[in-house]
UniProtKB/Swiss-Prot annotation:
CDD domains: CBS_pair_CorC_HlyC_assoc. Keywords: CBS domain, Cell membrane, Glycoprotein, Ion transport, Membrane, Phosphoprotein, Repeat, Transmembrane, Transmembrane helix, Transport. This is Metal transporter CNNM3. Residues 678-707 are annotated as: Disordered. It comes from Homo sapiens. GO terms for biological process: magnesium ion homeostasis; monoatomic ion transport. Pfam families: CBS.
């Protein structure tokens, strides 16, 4: 008996917590074991109870009565050793609070051990049978998912536009955009509360969806988590972003009502959250963002440009030395050199000694502001006076580093050099060319820059520039005003010649480019008979050669005063006044009606006799009689153009404009013949003219700007 007692198991009772809210006291709790007792069924060795424990011999069978709630369903109880699996020993329910359990303790163990009393709910029975049907779970999940998607869509549509963007649309948008902006502008006042309400609704819907999917998946966490994440990502995030991103402005005004409803439903929570969000969004943030964009910190193109400059070196964009405009240090700054500098269009010019690679100085165009070409100042004098520093860079320097050097104001032009260690001897610096700030900017914008001094037809560009809508202006040919050695020697300086040509072509209508071309006019002004001087005799102020024009005396010439003073006497009253440089007289002497002047200068099909000057044009019948007197008061330098010279200039201009055809071969002007023609006609006119050989003046002084 003692061995049997020693081998008997001790039955302890234990309360098992069931899965579906047993401890929390849900509405439909599972079965719980509150107590038990042995039932006497009359069988031998039915066991006994001692010290609150039921004892029996191995392989004995006895009957237990269980007490507790929940035994009326299909639950069943069992007794098993610790760590053992479930046993198929079903209890017989005897009511809502009682059940009978027949037990048989097997004799596998040779030592006493304890057994556990537990209750199990079968799959498909008990609380599982009380779960919602699948269609209800599906509808609930769809509703929660729609709520999450709606909250996210309202957030992306009604609250997507910032106040600054709404104001821009209201002021400069289309009619539909302005109407939508006017409806959205008041809603931005409670944007913080609306954002808090929508975030709360979206969070609640997503959390409830996860719990519902957990119940639907049989309380398995992994399928519930994966399913909830996938549905929220696709339906709750991607779809609202796609729809709101395309129709933001159309959906935003229509979604205001739903946004207000969300705020009302969650007002106790949305109001403090909205205040917190508005406090976090500092008013100065917009201004700081604008300043950041203005500085280029938020501009993606800034980083792109820097990346391009880091990948390129100076050697890739430099101008080769043989293509650079440079000056020798021994050059004399006469009119020809200054004209070539102006013609080049450069503001910084390198100066070299002996060979072009030996750059020793830099000449700025502004250094020549006070240089007179007639002084023939040596270039070395100017460069030594200003002594501009030279800026050297190596050929492998990155363009971003060169740009920083230029930005610091050192120079806008750098000399590119490299270390030449080829061959025998010591290494030396070899000059490759020049690089300017313009070259770096062209690399950034990926296009060629043509300034006002450049002509696309004369410039070798690296890239094709944008098409020019307006035609390029003709370059000024300053070299035309330089008198070459083989031309006639004239007493007028190149600067004064340039000023005279500009003044006549732009201020005096009879010498305008529509009548006389600029080249023909320049050729005319260089003629010795046109450039004249009058020496003033102090001892005889009323000398005959002092009178340029006399009242009622016929003349056939035009006069422009270049230097000196004259006295003009007008009318019978004898009104007198003085005039100086760049006053002109005798315009009417050139415009006396004639066959040549009556025909348009630009005509391409003139009549032959219209182009032939009448030999009698210098007679009194076509002479001009001024009603004023012009007398020299000092030494004069003047331009005197006779009518025959003017007619020859008209013929030369027409010959240039006429097409080359057999009918117009007699109108072609042979180079150099114009000067001879002017001289011959002037000599002929001098023999037959009754005017004074002195100097002439304008028909009516009232037409003279000086008068």
């Amino acid at each position: 008996m003692a061995a049997a007692v020693a081998a008997a198991g001790r039955l302890g009772w234990l309360f098992a917590a069931l899965c579906l809210g047993n401890a929390a006291g849900e509405a439909a709790p599972g079965p719980r074991v509150l107590g038990f007792c042995l039932e006497e069924d009359g069988a031998a060795g039915a066991g006994w109870v001692r010290g609150g424990a039921a004892r029996d011999t191995p392989d004995a069978t006895f009957l237990l009565r269980l007490f507790g709630p929940g035994f009326a369903n299909s639950s069943w109880s069992w007794v098993a050793p610790e760590g053992a699996g479930c046993r198929e020993e079903a209890a017989s329910p005897a009511g809502e609070w009682r059940a009978l359990l027949r037990l048989r303790l097997r004799a596998e163990a040779v030592r006493p051990h304890s057994a556990l009393l537990a209750v199990r709910v079968e799959p498909g029975g008990g609380a599982a049978e009380e779960a919602a049907p699948p269609w209800a779970l599906g509808l609930g999940a769809a509703g929660l998912l729609a709520l999450a998607a709606l909250a996210r869509g309202l957030q992306l549509s009604a609250l997507a536009l910032a106040p600054a963007e709404v104001q821009v649309l209201r002021e400069s948008g289309s009619e539909a955009e302005r109407a939508a902006a006017r409806r959205l502008e008041p809603a931005r006042r409670w944007a913080g509360c609306a954002l808090g309400a929508l975030l709360l609704l979206a969070s609640l819907a997503q959390a409830a969806l996860a719990v519902l999917l957990y119940r639907a998946a049989g309380q398995r966490a992994v399928p519930a988590v994966l399913g909830s994440a996938g549905l929220v990502f696709l339906v709750g995030e991607v779809v609202p972003a796609a729809v709101s991103g395309r129709w933001t402005l159309a959906l935003a005004p229509r979604a205001l009502g739903l946004s207000r409803l969300a705020v009302l439903l969650t007002l106790p929570v949305a109001l403090p959250v909205g205040q917190l969000l508005e406090l976090a969004a500092r008013p100065g943030r917009l201004r700081e963002r604008v300043l950041e964009l203005a500085r280029g910190g938020g501009d993606p193109y800034s980083d792109l440009s820097k990346g391009v400059l880091r990948c390129r070196t100076v050697e890739d964009v430099l101008t080769p030395l043989e293509d650079c405009f440079m000056l020798d240090a021994s050059t004399v700054l006469d009119f020809g050199v200054l004209a070539s500098i102006m013609q080049s269009g450069h503001t910084r010019i390198p100066v070299y000694e002996e060979e072009r690679s030996n750059i020793v100085d830099m000449l700025y165009l502004k250094d020549l502001a006070f240089v007179d070409p007639e002084d023939c100042t040596p270039l070395s004098t100017i460069t030594r006076f200003y002594n501009h520093p030279l800026h050297f860079v190596f050929n492998d320097t990155k363009l971003d580093a060169v740009l920083e050097e230029f930005k610091r104001g050192k120079s806008h032009l750098a000399i590119v050099q490299k270390v030449n260690n080829e061959g025998e001897g010591d290494p030396f610096y070899e000059v490759l060319g020049l690089v300017t700030l313009e070259d770096v900017i062209e690399e950034i914008i990926r296009s060629e820059i043509l300034d006002e001094s450049e002509d696309y037809r004369d410039t070798v560009v690296k890239r094709k520039p944008a098409s020019l809508m307006a035609p390029l202006k003709r370059k000024e040919e300053f070299s035309l005003f330089k008198v070459s050695d083989d031309e006639y020697k004239v007493t007028i300086s190149p600067q004064l010649l340039l000023a005279t040509q500009r003044f006549l072509s732009r201020e005096v209508d009879v010498f305008s480019p529509l009548r006389i071309s600029e080249k023909v006019l320049l050729h005319l002004l260089k003629h010795p008979s046109v450039n004249q001087e009058v020496r003033f005799d102090e001892s005889n102020r009323l000398a005959t050669h002092h009178y340029l024009y006399q009242r009622s005396q016929p003349v056939d010439y035009f006069i422009l005063i270049l230097q000196g003073r004259v006295e003009v006497e007008i009318g019978k009253e004898g009104l007198k006044f003085e005039n100086g440089a760049f006053t002109y007289y005798g315009v009417s002497a050139l415009t006396v009606p004639s066959s040549v002047h009556q025909s348009p200068v630009s005509s391409l099909q003139p009549i032959r006799h219209d182009l032939q000057p009448d030999p009698g044009d210098g007679t009194h019948s076509s002479a001009y009689c001024p009603d004023y007197t012009v007398r020299a008061l000092s030494d004069l330098q003047l331009i005197k153009v006779t009518r025959l010279q003017y007619l020859n200039a008209l013929l030369a201009t027409r010959a240039q404009n006429l097409p080359q055809s057999p009918e117009n071969t007699d109108l072609q002007v042979i180079p150099g013949s114009q000067t001879r023609l002017l001289g011959e006609k002037t000599t002929t006119a001098a023999g037959s003219s009754h005017s004074r050989p002195g100097v002439p003046v304008e028909g009516s002084p009232g037409r003279n700007p000086g008068v």
